[in-house]
UniProtKB/Swiss-Prot annotation:
GO terms for cellular component: plasma membrane. It is found in: Cell inner membrane. Keywords: Antiport, Cell inner membrane, Cell membrane, Ion transport, Membrane, Sodium, Sodium transport, Transmembrane, Transmembrane helix, Transport. It comes from Pseudomonas fluorescens (strain Pf0-1). Signal peptide: none annotated. It catalyses: Na(+)(in) + 2 H(+)(out) = Na(+)(out) + 2 H(+)(in). Its main location: membrane. It comes from the Bacteria. The gene is nhaA. Disulfide bonds: none annotated. This is Na(+)/H(+) antiporter NhaA. Belongs to the NhaA Na(+)/H(+) (TC 2.A.33) antiporter family. GO terms for molecular function: sodium:proton antiporter activity.
Amino acid sequence: MPLRSTFTRFFQLEAASGLLLIAAAILALIINNSPLSWLYNGLLDTPVVAQIGALKIAKPLLLWINDGLMALFFLLIGLEVKREVLDGQLSKPSQIVLPGAAAIGGMLVPALIYWFLNRDNPAALDGWAIPTATDIAFALGVLALLGKRVPVSLKLFLMTLAIIDDLGAIVIIAIFYSGELSTLSLGLAAACIAALVAMNRLGVVKLGPYMIIGLILWVCVLKSGVHATLAGVTLAFCIPLRTKNAEPSPLLTLEHALHPWVAYGILPLFAFANAGLSLSGVTVESFTHHVPMGIAVGLLLGKTLGVFGLTWLAVKTGIAALPQGANWGQVLGVAILCGIGFTMSLFVGSLAFVPGASEYAGMDRMGILTGSVFAALIGYAVTAAASRKNTALPS
C-alpha cells in the first residue's frame, strides 16, 4: 500500500477514534457521578477468571482491560513503529530529526515540571512519566476538525512525533514500571521471543503461529513482573513486513485488521473504564494539589514548551525545516495539542498510582483530564487562528 494511502487511512481512523474517545470519557464521568455509579464501579470490579489446567489468571475486569486488551493496543503501536522504521517516515533520517527533537522535548520538559512541583514528596514522584505521554488519536481527532485548512505535512509531523512519543512511553514502562521479577517466567518469555525471531528468520509468513506464541508470551510476561502490554510490542517487532514471494505483507495485514478494533473498540473501552472520575468531594483546592497540578501543568505548559522549543531550535540551527506549507502559529497549535495525554497518560497513571494501593490514585485523573481538555481547546483555537491564512512564515 502506498505511503500516502496508508497515512490517509491511519489519520482517518485515529481522528474518528479521537472523537469516540471524547464521548466515552464524558459518558464515564456522567455515569460515575450519577445514581448509577454503583453499577459502573461494580462492573469494573467484577472478577474474571481464565484457567487452563493448573494455569489460572484471576483479575477484576478493569485489569483485564488494562493488561489484556491494551496489549493489543501496544501490538498495534509496535506494528506502526516497525512499518515506519523500515518503510515510512522513520526510515529517512532527514525526516526523523524534527519530530524526533520535538518528541524528546515533549517528554523531558513535562517530566521536569512535574518533578519540580513534587520534588519534596518521594511517593508522588512515581507519577513523573504521566505528563510525558501524548494521545495520538485524541490529538489527531482535534486536528481533523480543521479539515483541509491544515497541511498534510503538519498532520504527518504530529503523527510521527506521537509515534516516537509512544516508543518513548514503551521504554519508560519497561524500565520504570515493572514489578518484582520472576526468573522462571522471564526465561519462558525469552524462549517465546527466540521462537518468534526464528520464525521471522526462517520466512514464516502465516500469522497464526505468531499469534499463538504471542499469546503464550503475554501470559509469561504477565507472570514475570514486567508489564504485560510489552508482550504486544515484542510480538509486533517479530512479525515480518516484507515477504520473498508476492504474498501479502503479514505486518500490514495484521495492522489493517487490528486498527479498527483498537480505534473503535479497545481505546474507547479503556477510556470509559479509566476516565470515570468521581467528583464527590472535589473542590477547587483539589486541583491545586501538587500531583494533579504537576500533571496538568506538565501536559499543558510542559508539552508546549518542549515540543515548540525543540522544534524552533532545530529549525533555527538549520538541522531541520518546518513542515511544508506550515507556519509557526500552526506548529505552536500542534505543540499545545500534544498536551492531550488522555489514554496514554491514564495508562501510565494506572501503573504509577495503583488504584487501592496509592493515596494519589484518582488525583492523577483530575490532572490528566484538566490538562488534556485545556490542551484540546487552546490547541484547536491557536491552530484554527493560525490556519486562516495558511502561508508559511519565514524560518
